[in-house]
């Protein structure tokens, strides 16, 4: 399935006139930035919200996100100049940057100490150039003039960085002659984009951004291969309200104590289980840092009947057994493992430990909470499959109001359980985020949970069309106006609160609609 190309904006599910006005404003700013250049095409990719299944994608367990209407758009001019110039409609926060091109298409060095938005574009340049080489399309990269526009909140947990990287990669490839790329290939090459800026992403964000379809959510699987499978919800008046807590979560700057530390803790937890269960070489070293993964541990435990990712009942049974194993093998050290305790269990020297776990990405910690992290991964993965089972059983029943209400209550409870684990086991929530969830549940939400990396960012709320207004008003009154008394209502409704249907994924847009 290829990334689509559209000649108009009819694929947008939100206000068509508002959308066209946004594109026309982008054209106006592009022409102001580059008066002697014309736009050849647009590339775009949306943000995403994860409905359930956080901090499990990099352990290769399936997740359930959807693409949202908020997206990153880039207007592109292709030329033969030896440079790429990137600009943004928000020039105050994203200043103009020029990236010189060399004959060898190298030199895209990323200064991890300099947190510039150009670093993310360079990530896209690296993966796009690698793909061109892989496809035997190696040649001098085209010069480009680009103006970006994005309405995915930065640091809001809605994958603004993934949307930017995917849109940038798609633009670079299209400019350099790749007019037809599969969704699978675009996902595969962009999954590693943010690794170049030191953020250890797992693949869900990029896959959801690429594979999104209108009115459909996505089951994203990582084994046996990375793929997105669209599906519809059985309740017609179901909707999701996404609220930005306005606590900015900068993954790059906080990664050593948050996101990357979870990756390391889960990797060590997997290796500790390998040792305790005597699994030896049955577990592949396939994590992002070259260690065992918690999915690999489960597959090794059930080596003769590995879960294929499709049979929901088998997956549920195996995950329940893995939760019991975690309770048996790791529960005796809930306060956390010291490095010395890890060395003893893993039979490693300090230098070997540092080389294996602490070299790939910087982390800071006092103790490593292996029990909590492993338990979260297996319980959260179980909830994803329980949601799938709920979807499959509801879709085969009648569509009465009682059935709809039953589905909403059950799915909401799974989301609430997820939030509890994210708070207590993964420790990626905080008091203010918990407060938002509590307020929402009192004002029409069936289930509310943080989404994305956490530690700030956004909350996703399950509700219905007839309750969404009450929910939004309750959050404005009891959270936003108390925490941010000077904030304007129109700013909230435009930037902090999104009521989004599942939306179209990555695509190219021609300039025909401008004619």
UniProtKB/Swiss-Prot annotation:
Which top-level group of life is the source organism from?
Answer: Eukaryota
Extract the SUPFAM superfamilies matched here: GHMP Kinase, C-terminal domain (SSF55060), Ribosomal protein S5 domain 2-like (SSF54211)
State where ATP binds.
Answer: 155, 157, 159-160, 249-251
Residues carrying the site annotation Transition state stabilizer: 48
Q: Name one GO molecular function term.
A: galactokinase activity
Under the heading InterPro entries, the entry gives: Galactokinase, Galactokinase_CS, GalKase_N, GHMP_kinase_C_dom, GHMP_kinase_C_sf, GHMP_kinase_N_dom, GHMP_knse_ATP-bd_CS, Mevalonate/galactokinase
EC class (word): transferase
Q: EC annotation?
A: 2.7.1.6
Which family, according to the similarity comment?
Answer: Belongs to the GHMP kinase family. GalK subfamily.
Q: What is this protein's record name? A: Galactokinase
Q: Which organism is it from?
A: Candida albicans (Yeast)
């Amino acid at each position: 399935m290829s990334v689509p190309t559209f000649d108009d904006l009819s694929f947008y599910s939100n206000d068509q006139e508002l959308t066209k006005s946004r594109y026309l404003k982008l054209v106006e700013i592009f022409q102001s930035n580059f008066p002697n250049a014309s736009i050849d095409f647009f590339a775009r990719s949306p943000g995403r919200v994860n409905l359930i299944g956080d901090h499990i994608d990099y352990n290769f367990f399936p997740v359930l996100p959807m693409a949202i209407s908020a997206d990153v758009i880039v207007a592109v001019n292709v030329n033969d100049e030896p440079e790429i110039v990137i600009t943004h409609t928000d020039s105050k926060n994203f200043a103009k940057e020029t990236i010189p091109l060399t004959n060898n298409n190298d030199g895209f060095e990323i200064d991890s100490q300099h947190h510039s938005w150009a670093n993310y574009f360079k990530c896209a340049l690296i993966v796009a150039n690698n793909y061109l080489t892989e496809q035997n399309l190696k040649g001098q990269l085209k010069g480009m003039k680009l103006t970006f526009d994005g309405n995915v909140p930065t640091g809001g947990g809605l994958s603004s960085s993934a949307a930017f990287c995917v849109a940038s990669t798609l633009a670079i490839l299209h400019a350099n002659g790749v007019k037809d790329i599969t969704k699978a290939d675009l996902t595969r090459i962009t999954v590693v984009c943010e690794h170049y800026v030191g953020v250890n992403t797992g693949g869900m964000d990029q896959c959801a951004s690429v594979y999104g379809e209108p009115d459909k959510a996505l089951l994203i699987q990582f084994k046996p291969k990375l793929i997105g499978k669209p599906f519809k919800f059985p309740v017609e008046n179901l909707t999701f309200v996404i609220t930005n807590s306005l606590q900015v979560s900068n993954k790059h700057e906080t990664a050593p104590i948050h996101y990357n530390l979870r990756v390391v803790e889960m990797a060590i937890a997997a290796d500790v289980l390998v040792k305790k269960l005597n699994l030896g070489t049955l577990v592949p070293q396939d994590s992002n840092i070259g260690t065992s993964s918690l999915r690999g541990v489960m597959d090794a435990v059930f080596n003769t009947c590995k879960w294929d990712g499709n049979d929901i009942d088998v997956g549920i049974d195996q995950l329940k057994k893995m939760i019991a194993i975690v309770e048996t093998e790791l529960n005796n050290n809930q306060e956390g493992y010291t490095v010395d305790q890890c060395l003893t269990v893993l039979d490693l020297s300090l230098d070997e430990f540092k080389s294996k776990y602490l070299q790939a990405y910087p982390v800071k910690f006092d103790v490593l909470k292996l029990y909590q992290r492993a338990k979260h991964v297996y319980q959260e993965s179980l909830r994803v499959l329980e949601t799938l089972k709920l979807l499959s059983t509801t879709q085969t029943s009648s569509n009465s109001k009682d059935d709809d209400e039953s589905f909403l209550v059950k799915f909401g409870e799974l989301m609430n359980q997820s939030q509890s684990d994210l708070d207590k086991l993964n420790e990626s929530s905080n008091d203010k985020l918990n407060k938002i969830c509590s307020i929402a549940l009192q004002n029409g939400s069936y289930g509310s949970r943080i989404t994305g990396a956490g530690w700030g960012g956004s909350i996703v709320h399950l509700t219905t069309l007839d309750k969404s207004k009450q929910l939004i008003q309750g959050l404005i009154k009891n959270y936003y106006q108390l925490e941010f008394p000077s904030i304007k209502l129109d700013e909230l409704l435009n930037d902090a609160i999104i009521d989004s249907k599942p939306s179209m994924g990555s695509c190219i847009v021609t300039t025909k609609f401008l004619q």
